[in-house]
């Protein structure tokens, strides 16, 4: 594969870059004059066209150049801001290329390959006046000679602009922003002034004691030079100023001191034994395998800002719950585990494709992990019925403030538990509003791929398809949003009246908040039907959504299960009333669906997210159940695969009476049409209760 990957693959791009580079470096430049203004290093349009007519056959052999094509090429270079007019007219639209006009280059040879670094806008440059680089203005008018009293463009900032000297300022250092300058050379420093004599009778006072105290204070002040909040005036009297930006952007002083101590130890050739983690450490119990040894300089809480590698840091509790790092080196026995887990992924995708009756999305299928499926189906906590965590220790699924708000609403009115110590007396509606707005900025358990797959499955039922097609948002119903809002105006209102207590600046605060809002759909109050209309009676649809939820990563499966349980506890709590007429909710159930759907789904329309949330609430026990028949089928295939590879030269292990025996295989079902039954049979049919349902009853 490395032999196929060469520059021949991008021949047009390399050829275009070569033409630009050759044109910029070899075209003869001179000083042109028009009226009272002159432009150095400029050229006429006719000279550029003649140059291309001569040089283009040398770059591209067997090619006859035409003057019209060369003019179009120079027009394209004007669009790419490579060249521009030296004496432009004050018109809004740029004039087309002409051979009679004068042009100059807007980019140097280095800028054609590497863009210029731009400095950050800051209120203080502190020690950065030698190292800061400010981008030069793109206006070609800055390179012209002007008469002394010519009008300059009205630019208020004095940091970078109004350059009235010929040519571009090619100095390596940046332009000082005198608007933020904090000292004057003519002014005497405050410490060097003579003391102000308030009483004229003390004019014979001796100033020698004052000068001695000033020297002592300067000696004390040098102790704090390493602090990150030193003033920018500190080094302005020194000849050689430091080139670093500021101490707050550099590495921590404690880390520097520790590195100096390590360098001193190395110079003395004193070797210390390496740090080894205990073999029974918690990190080694993680299913993804152990981490490399942590360097000694990261053992303290202060870590280096410059050049810190997150993959080498020790795994924290919060970090475990957020993501499973792919940079962790797996253990040696993981190959066999992955081979065994491939049965789970293959069977789940095959069964789901059989029910879906079409090809599954490749983006979603490639992210499914067989280990997650096996863990989600087998490792279930018998206390609450939620799948166990794959990490050791405590893993919070949400930030601590969100957990406190959810705990407050679940345990309200605190009859059997201790009241939450928040320090303030919160109102229930105020807590709920804050929780709604916080959830918009967090990652939801159901991402874009899962949401689109569940919506397509629900649209196979006419009643659910009608819910998406009806209403004022009909033209947006089947459009999944996959990118952030293209403009600020699209943000509009936030989620339905729950955000009235937030300031206006909070609308643009989060990309997830903008992504959840659409220009039309999410502003409209959508009608929520009764709970029975969201119940699923088709067994094939229940099984399909079960498999989609079981294919989630374990952390997201746990998060979704806990959050839907939390919504159920809110909608059944009759002590408080969360209904708000401004968003169309008349009871707690409607208010929870309207406000909390962003905690279930992400990157989808409001109508689709509310439908998925309502379906999960109405069919909670059946959708979060574990299909026992599917587990038995996969285990049977695993046993057949093991028996196939066990040869006659190895003695077969006799199974005891308690070992699992494969049941009789079921007949395969072809498509969702096989599952369709008459209305009488559907009415009389009782839904099969799985293992998870029996656990919930206990």
From Swiss-Prot:
Keywords of the record: Cell cycle, Cell division, Cytoplasm, Developmental protein, Mitosis
Biased composition (Basic residues): 146-157
Subcellular locations according to the entry: Cytoplasm; Cytoplasm, Cell cortex
Top-level taxon of origin: Eukaryota
InterPro entries given in the database record: DEP_dom (IPR000591), WH-like_DNA-bd_sf (IPR036388), WH_DNA-bd_sf (IPR036390)
GO biological process terms held by the UniProt record: cell division; establishment of mitotic spindle orientation; intracellular signal transduction
Region of interest (Disordered), ranges: 115-188, 653-672
Principal location class: cytoplasm
Any Pfam family the entry gives: DEP
CDD domains given in the database record: DEP
Domain named DEP: residues: 23-107
Gene3D superfamilies cross-referenced by the UniProt entry: Winged helix-like DNA-binding domain superfamily/Winged helix DNA-binding domain
GO cellular component, one term: cell cortex
SUPFAM superfamilies assigned: Winged helix' DNA-binding domain
Composition skew (Basic and acidic residues), residue ranges: 178-188
PANTHER family: DEP DOMAIN-CONTAINING, PROTEIN LET-99
Described purpose of this protein according to its UniProt entry: Required for the proper orientation of spindles after the establishment of polarity. May play a role in interactions between the astral microtubules and the cortical cytoskeleton. Required for asymmetric forces on nuclei and spindles. Acts downstream of the PAR signaling as an intermediate that transduces polarity information to the machinery that positions the mitotic spindle, possibly by regulating force generation. Regulates gpr-1/2 asymmetric cortical localization during the first embryonic cell divisions. Acts antagonistically to the gpr-1/2 signaling pathway.
Entry protein name: Protein let-99
């Amino acid at each position: 594969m490395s032999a196929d990957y060469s520059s021949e693959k991008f021949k047009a791009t390399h050829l275009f870059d070569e033409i630009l580079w050759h044109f910029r470096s070899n075209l003869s430049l001179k000083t042109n004059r028009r009226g009272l203004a002159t432009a150095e290093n400029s050229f006429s349009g006719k000279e550029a066209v003649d140059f291309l007519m001569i040089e283009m056959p040398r770059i591209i052999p067997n090619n006859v150049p035409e003057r019209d094509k060369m003019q179009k090429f120079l027009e394209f270079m004007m669009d790419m801001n490579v060249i521009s007019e030296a004496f432009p007219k004050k018109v809004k639209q740029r004039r087309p290329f002409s051979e009679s006009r004068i042009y100059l280059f807007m980019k140097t040879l280095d800028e054609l390959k590497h863009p210029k670094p731009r400095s950050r806008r800051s209120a203080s440059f502190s020690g950065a006046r030698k190292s800061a680089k400010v981008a030069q203005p793109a206006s070609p008018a800055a390179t012209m000679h002007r008469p002394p009293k010519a009008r300059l463009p009205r630019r208020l900032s004095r940091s970078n602009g109004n350059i009235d000297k010929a040519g571009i300022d090619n100095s390596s250092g940046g332009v000082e922003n005198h608007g933020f300058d904090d000292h004057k050379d003519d002014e005497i420093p405050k410490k060097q002034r003579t003391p102000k004599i308030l009483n004229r009778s003390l004019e014979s006072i001796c100033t020698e004691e004052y000068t001695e105290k000033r020297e002592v204070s300067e000696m004390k002040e040098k102790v704090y030079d390493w602090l990150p909040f030193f003033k920018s005036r500190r080094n302005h009297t020194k000849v050689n100023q430091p080139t670093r930006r500021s101490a707050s952007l550099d590495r921590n002083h404690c880390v520097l001191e520790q590195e100096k101590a390590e360098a001193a130890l190395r110079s003395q050739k004193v070797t210390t034994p390496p740090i080894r983690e205990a073999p029974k450490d918690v990190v080694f119990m993680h299913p993804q395998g152990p981490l490399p040894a942590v360097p000694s300089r990261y053992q303290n809480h202060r870590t280096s800002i410059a050049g810190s590698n997150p993959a080498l840091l020790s795994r924290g509790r919060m970090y475990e719950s957020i993501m499973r790092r792919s940079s962790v080196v797996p253990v040696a026995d993981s190959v066999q585990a992955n081979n065994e887990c491939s049965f789970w992924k293959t069977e789940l995708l095959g069964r789901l494709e059989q029910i879906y009756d079409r090809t599954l999305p490749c983006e979603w299928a490639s992210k499914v992990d067989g280990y997650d499926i096996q863990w989600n189906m087998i490792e279930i906590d018998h206390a609450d019925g939620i799948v166990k965590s794959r990490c050791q220790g405590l893993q919070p699924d949400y930030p601590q403030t969100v957990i406190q708000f959810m705990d407050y609403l679940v345990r309200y009115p605190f009859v059997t538990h201790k009241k939450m110590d928040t320090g303030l007396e919160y109102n229930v509606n105020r807590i709920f509003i804050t929780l709604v707005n916080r959830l918009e900025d967090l990652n939801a358990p159901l991402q874009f791929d899962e949401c689109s797959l569940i919506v397509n499955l629900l649209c196979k039922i006419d009643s659910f398809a009608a819910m998406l097609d009806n209403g004022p948002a009909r033209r947006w119903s089947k459009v999944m949003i996959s990118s952030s809002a293209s403009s600020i105006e699209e943000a509009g209102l936030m989620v339905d009246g729950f955000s009235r207590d937030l300031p206006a600046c909070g609308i643009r605060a989060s990309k997830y908040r903008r992504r959840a809002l659409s220009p039309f759909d999410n502003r409209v109050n959508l009608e929520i039907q009764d709970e029975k209309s969201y119940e699923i009676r088709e067994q094939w649809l229940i099984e399909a959504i079960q498999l989609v939820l079981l294919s989630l990563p374990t952390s997201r499966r746990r998060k979704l299960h806990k959050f839907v349980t939390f919504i159920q506890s809110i909608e059944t709590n009759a002590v408080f009333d969360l209904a708000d007429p401004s968003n169309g909710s008349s009871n707690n159930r409607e208010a929870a669906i309207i406000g909390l759907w962003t905690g279930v789904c992400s990157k989808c329309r409001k109508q689709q997210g509310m439908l998925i949330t309502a379906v999960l609430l109405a069919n909670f026990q059946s959708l979060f159940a574990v299909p026992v028949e599917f587990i038995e089928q996969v285990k049977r295939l695993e046993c057949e695969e093991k028996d196939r590879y066990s040869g006659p030269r190895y003695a077969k292990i006799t199974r005891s009476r308690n070992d699992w025996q494969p049941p009789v295989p079921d007949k395969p079902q072809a498509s969702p049409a096989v599952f369709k039954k008459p209305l009488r049979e559907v009415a009389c049919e009782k839904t099969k209760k799985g293992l998870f349902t029996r656990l919930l009853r206990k």
